[in-house]
Amino acid sequence: MPSFKVNFSSTNDIGTGIASAAQAGTIRPTMKGPHIADRRTLSRRTFLRGAGVAMALPLLESMTPVFARAKQPGTPRRVLAICNNLGLLPDRFFPKNSGRDYELSPYLNELKSYRDDFTVLSGVSHPGVDGSHSSDVSFLTCAPHPGGGGFRNSISVDQFIAAKIGHLTRFPSLTLGVNASVGRRSLSWTDAGVLIPCENRASSVYRRLFLQGSEEEIERQVRKLQLGESIMDTLAQESKALTRRLSAADRDRLDQYTTAVREAERRLVMARAWERKPKPTPPMGMPSDPSNRNAFMQMTRLMYQMARLAFQTDSTRCVTLLMDGNNSPAIKVAGTKITDGYHNLSHHGMNKDKLTQLDAIDREQMKLLGELIRDLKNVEEAEGNLLKNTVVMYGSNFGDANKHTTTNMPVLVAGGRLKHGQHLAFDRTNNYPLPNLFVSIMQSMNLPVDKFATSTGTMQGLLPA
């Protein structure tokens, strides 16, 4: 049977990106990714070519750009999830009273200008998530017992969202870090429980977002993507043939593997579609990366800027940021001399000097969060501003890092189409499930989701009536 090539000759901007990426490659019929109805934008002049024959196609749904077909009405909705994996001093973060008339705590007072733009949560945690310092890997997955033997993670909420809307943007998601231990710690995990490495360099994020690359570099990348697709196709065929000879348990393992293969295949296809589409014009120059890991606050500010630019240019709608204090030395904080590593300070044992230093670190983080809220709010969009269309979740896997407790997690939610200006106080002994927040966030993004991980519903008091 002759192999066929699909010749894309469209001149629309999405079609052009796919055209140039696909012209040199053979589209194999067994590959899931390039299925015409789901994965390609076809020109009305598209032909099937093979063995000297060119056959025109009838008018197909796929001749409408997939990015136009799938585009949700109105302004895009986004999410930014931030985790500081060494927590905050609880008595200085949580308000003493609840409701709309709560009194701002010392830390929340740093955000007083934006009181009506955020909600603070108390008495929340992930059911079954313990594991001490390992618990940060479950911050967005909610997978229980991360410190236990044989633990296997599950999909993080950002990747769950990206699977639904990631095709609408150049990057389905961005996984960022500040001093994150690459390959060991991340907030983002695939549906097969595989860690997605953090990008710690703001300059690298900037390059991905805005620098196009030369024609030769683009061609080289396209060839790599084509080779990757071919490999994925071969792997899929081989695994199908192998299945018939395996036990039930091995078939389950192989199914997990092929799921990862299909996900990689899908990402390859989307990458080809975007490879030649022009990148947006950068609103600012390339950032300069700090040379020392003690510039924790400077790196945090830069990553907040990169997240804002990614949303502002609609390069992605899902961003995670892990601030890894475990991997940070004595960090710089203006006005305070920090004499010990961040992790050691978090185990303060009520030492007055350590508490003073830790308080300065926590307050500086709140100030930076305030800057982020301000900057998002200052970007006007068709329906309000960038903050109104972006849910920002800031929190920690630790309720109290000094005691390694993973209950009573400090969580603040800003922006988006949620009810704000309140303190939602739940039972600090019998905690309310934090996964319910994730369901509410997704529903506020117009995603038809009723369940995620160990959720029991939506979060009480957060969604507008």
Regions found by a protein language model. Name each.
Residues 2-465:
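Ligand-binding pockets and gating/stacking loops
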